[in-house]
């Protein structure tokens, strides 16, 4: 079997790619819109009511700051390891190692929960089919997409992005029609909130706790950081990020705003998409089926993006000495795919599925909540790394600090809600375990540097 190292064809980190900025923007939208938005946002609405719109605005701002500094670092110093390479450059080997394995572990856990959600949603049509059959089918499909290589992944994500945006626009159009009185329903609309109590349903604690779910809806930008290496012009990264975040923020805020003005806060259910809930009483028999399909597509898309991301990053980590050399081998017959890296990701995915199906529901919820928080820890590292790596003007640094504060607010907000508080503690435990491994790896790194 012919194999090569996990390097770009040119052998340089800064080698030219074939993506235009708008393709990266579209891919970013595809990799971001997922179950966190279509399903998780219901929990945020239940916690804070109409003020979830403000939560999404703040999350969009925080996410834009993260992507903007990541794109700037990529344009200035293109690295295949993306945020891990910049953390290593800023703080040393331990930081790159910790970021990489933190990203790998959190994504594997999140993918397991996504597969479980997709399987449950699929039983909307096929009640008798066991969950494990759907989970296995979606996992195999995701692996096939990754096996098609970067070009195949790009095409699939771009197509799915269009489908997801179309579904959201369909909701916005239908919701607008109901508010204008063009569609009749058996429900009294709450309309715009006329008091602070109506807007912030559970006061500041509820709003604070809802931030984490707004940030979850923007999860996935790390993959775009990795894909930014494929841009024809690396300096177009910030432009791609601005367009991506503007589109995401616009459709998120408008759709959320419409949903919370159509039905009362008590109608929302954490097991149902808020958009389906909003149109439940408008006699649209096709809508639950269409939107259920859209949610499945969204979840599959983000899960595939995560699998692609962990496969790509583990390959680079192997080259940097942060994973066994086996994972840096690429197979020419399979479009230069790091097969061992994909295999480990698939094995982790299988373990995560089994855990999701066998473990008591609440315990697994804590683990998946922790996985989402771990991803935000990486976002913190991205911003902190940029403060050391980039030469920025004072206002750019202030902007970065604002991003730090927003992410810290979302993470700490989990302490204000007892149902998700254990997830915060689990995230600390997992981060400490990664830190301990990094501490003991110092001897290995010293030996490597000496030799």
Where in the sequence are the language-model features?
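Membrane-interface "cap" regions at the ends of multi-pass membrane proteins
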Residues: 1-40, 47-48, 64, 68, ...
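Helix-loop-helix connectors at the membrane interface of multi-pass transporters/channels
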Residues: 2-3, 8-10, 85-88, 115-135, ...
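Helix-loop-helix junctions that connect adjacent transmembrane segments
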Residues: 3, 9-15, 127-130, 161-293, ...
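Extracellular loop-to-transmembrane helix junctions
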Residues: 16-19, 39-127, 131, 244-253, ...
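TM-loop-TM module centered on a large, flexible mid-protein loop between adjacent transmembrane helices
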Residues: 85-87, 92, 124, 243-304, ...
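Membrane-helix boundary/coupling elements in multi-pass transport proteins
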Residues: 102-115, 225, 229-230, 288-325, ...
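Membrane-interface loop-to-helix entry segments
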Residues: 132-190, 241-246, 372-381, 392-403, ...
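A generic transmembrane alpha-helix motif of multi-pass inner-membrane proteins
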Residues: 178, 371, 375, 384-451
């Amino acid at each position: 079997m012919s194999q090569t190292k996990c390097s770009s064809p040119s052998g340089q980190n800064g080698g030219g790619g074939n993506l235009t900025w708008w393709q990266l923007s579209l891919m970013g939208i595809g990799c971001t819109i997922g179950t966190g938005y279509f399903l998780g946002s219901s929990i945020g609405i239940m916690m804070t009511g109409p003020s979830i719109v403000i939560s999404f605005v703040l999350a969009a701002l925080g996410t834009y700051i993260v992507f903007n500094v990541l794109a700037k670092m990529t344009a200035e110093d293109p690295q295949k390891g993306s945020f891990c390479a910049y953390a290593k450059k800023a703080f040393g080997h331990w930081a790159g190692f910790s970021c990489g394995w933190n990203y790998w572990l959190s994504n594997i856990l999140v993918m397991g929960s996504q597969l479980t959600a997709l399987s449950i949603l699929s039983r909307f049509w096929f009640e008798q089919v066991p969950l494990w059959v759907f989970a296995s089918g979606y996992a195999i499909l995701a692996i096939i997409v990754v096996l098609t290589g970067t070009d195949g992944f790009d095409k699939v994500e771009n197509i799915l992005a269009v489908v997801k945006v179309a579904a959201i626009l369909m909701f916005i159009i239908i919701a607008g029609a109901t508010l204008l009185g063009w569609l009749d329903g058996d429900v009294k609309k709450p309309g715009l909130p006329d008091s602070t109590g109506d807007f912030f349903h559970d006061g500041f604690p509820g709003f604070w706790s809802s931030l984490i779910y707004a940030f979850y809806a923007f999860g996935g930008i790390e993959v775009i950081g990795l894909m930014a290496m494929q841009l024809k012009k690396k300096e177009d990264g910030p432009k791609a990020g601005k367009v991506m975040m503007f589109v995401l923020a616009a459709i998120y805020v408008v759709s959320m705003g419409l949903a919370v003005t159509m039905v009362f806060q008590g109608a929302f259910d954490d097991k149902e998409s808020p958009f389906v809930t909003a149109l439940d009483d408008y006699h649209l028999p096709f809508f639950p089926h269409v939107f259920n399909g859209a949610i499945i597509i969204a979840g599959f898309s983000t899960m595939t993006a995560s699998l692609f991301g962990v496969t790509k990053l583990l390959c680079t980590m192997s080259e940097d000495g942060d994973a066994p050399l086996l994972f840096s081998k690429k197979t020419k017959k399979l479009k230069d795919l790091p097969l061992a890296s994909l295999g480990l990701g698939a094995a982790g995915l299988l373990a995560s599925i089994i855990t999701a199906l066998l473990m008591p529901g609440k315990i697994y919820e804590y683990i998946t909540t922790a996985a989402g928080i771990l991803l935000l820890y990486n976002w913190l590292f991205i911003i902190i790394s940029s403060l050391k790596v980039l030469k920025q003007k004072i206002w750019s640094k202030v902007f970065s600090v604002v991003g730090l504060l927003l992410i810290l607010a979302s993470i700490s907000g989990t302490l204000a809600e007892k149902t998700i508080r254990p997830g915060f503690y689990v995230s600390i435990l997992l981060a400490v375990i990664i830190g301990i491994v990094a501490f003991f790896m110092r001897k290995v790194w010293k030996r490597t540097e000496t030799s």
